[in-house]
């Protein structure tokens, strides 16, 4: 995944930030969102 500068405690929190970044839903790793490129 592609790390973005968004803090998280769970993967559901990353859905919108990843979409806003123009990518697909990713997951929360090391308290940061990691998105899946399209």
UniProtKB/Swiss-Prot annotation:
Keywords: Disulfide bond, Ion channel impairing toxin, Neurotoxin, Potassium channel impairing toxin, Secreted, Toxin, Voltage-gated potassium channel impairing toxin. Its main location: secreted. Pfam families: Toxin_2. Disulfide bonds join 8-28, 14-33, 18-35. Expressed by the venom gland. GO terms for cellular component: extracellular region. GO terms for molecular function: ion channel inhibitor activity; potassium channel regulator activity; toxin activity. InterPro entries: Scorpion_toxin-like_sf (IPR036574), Scorpion_toxinS_K_inh (IPR001947). Negative results: shows weak blocking activity on KCa3.1/KCNN4 (IC(50)=1152 nM). Does not block Kv2.1/KCNB1 (Ki >2000 nM). Potent inhibitor of the Shaker potassium channels and its mammalian homologs (Kv1.1/KCNA1, Kv1.3/KCNA3, Kv1.6/KCNA6) (Ki<1 nM for all channels). Also blocks Kv1.2/KCNA2 (IC(50)=26.8 nM). It also shows a weak interaction with nicotinic acetylcholine receptors (nAChR), suggesting it may weakly inhibit it. Has the structural arrangement of an alpha-helix connected to a beta-sheet by disulfide bonds (CSalpha/beta). This is Potassium channel toxin alpha-KTx 3.2. It comes from Leiurus hebraeus.
